[in-house]
């Protein structure tokens, strides 16, 4: 019985090696500074920092819009 379990375990490890599983150390690091380069709403000339939105329509590229 034990030899059958050993053979089954060996086959499973050969088919699905532990290196195929992504561990936490293999994950990409989160880089908030890189993400902020794509989002430039705060630097938009029509952005109102008090309201935290734009008074103009969203079609001009400033989001979030104050107007519906």
UniProtKB/Swiss-Prot annotation:
It holds the Pfam family Conotoxin. One of its GO terms (cellular component) is extracellular region. Residues 21-52 form a propeptide. Expressed by the venom duct. It is found in: Secreted. Coiled coil: none annotated. Disulfide bonds join 53-66, 54-62, 58-65. Residues 1-20 form the signal peptide. The keyword Ion transport does not apply. InterPro entries: Conotoxin. Keywords: Cleavage on pair of basic residues, Disulfide bond, Hydroxylation, Neurotoxin, Secreted, Signal, Toxin. Belongs to the conotoxin M superfamily. The keyword Signal applies. The cysteine framework is III (CC-C-C-CC). Classified in the M-2 branch, since 2 residues stand between the fourth and the fifth cysteine residues. This is Conotoxin TsMMSK-021. It comes from Conus tessulatus. GO terms for molecular function: ion channel inhibitor activity; toxin activity. The modification 4-hydroxyproline is found at residue 64.
